[in-house]
């Protein structure tokens, strides 16, 4: 589907796999939401959980996703026959856009989004468009004694993607 809004972060085409469509531009997750609020949010999935009801007829899927301003929880409760389409499209590392309503989950004891529609999206990559590239003098990687989570190969690949001609690691 073609999304009905322009975004600096989200590409304009999306793949709808649950519901009828997305008609609103997404809000930032950092805004305050309450029970009953109807929202459209986007984010990158970083964790998922799944369960099947005791009778085997209902699939319960929980996804945790973030737009880098905050994080929210998405809970999909659907017939078991829909489980594969949900599991294959909502995975850690994938980005989604969701329209739904905030509801209090009495089982998890927190607010989560019950979706009407969910679509897979692609995010626009950050670019360094400067003619003269900047110099980063200090980085920590997993090779550092200091705490770091970025592998050196990821930093080298990002520098290459931004058009840097050289990189030095000491």
Question: Would you name each region that the model predicts?
Answer:
Residues 1-170:
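Phosphodiester-processing cores and adjacent nucleic acid-binding clamps
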């Amino acid at each position: 589907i073609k999304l009905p809004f322009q975004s600096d972060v989200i590409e304009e085409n999306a793949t709808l796999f649950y519901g009828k469509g997305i008609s609103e531009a997404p809000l930032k997750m950092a805004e305050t939401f309450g029970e009953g609020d109807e929202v459209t949010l986007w984010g990158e999935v970083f964790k998922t959980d799944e369960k099947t009801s005791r009778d085997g007829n209902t699939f319960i899927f929980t996804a945790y996703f973030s737009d880098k301003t905050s994080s929210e929880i998405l809970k999909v409760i659907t017939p078991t026959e829909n489980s594969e389409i949900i599991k294959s499209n909502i995975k850690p590392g994938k980005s989604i856009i969701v329209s739904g309503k905030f509801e209090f989950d009495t089982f998890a004891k927190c607010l989560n989004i019950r979706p009407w529609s969910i679509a897979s999206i692609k995010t626009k990559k950050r670019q360094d468009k400067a003619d003269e590239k900047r110099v980063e003098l200090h980085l920590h990687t997993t090779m550092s004694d200091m705490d770091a989570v970025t592998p050196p190969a990821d930093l080298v690949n990002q520098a290459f993607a931004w058009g840097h001609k050289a990189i030095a690691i000491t």
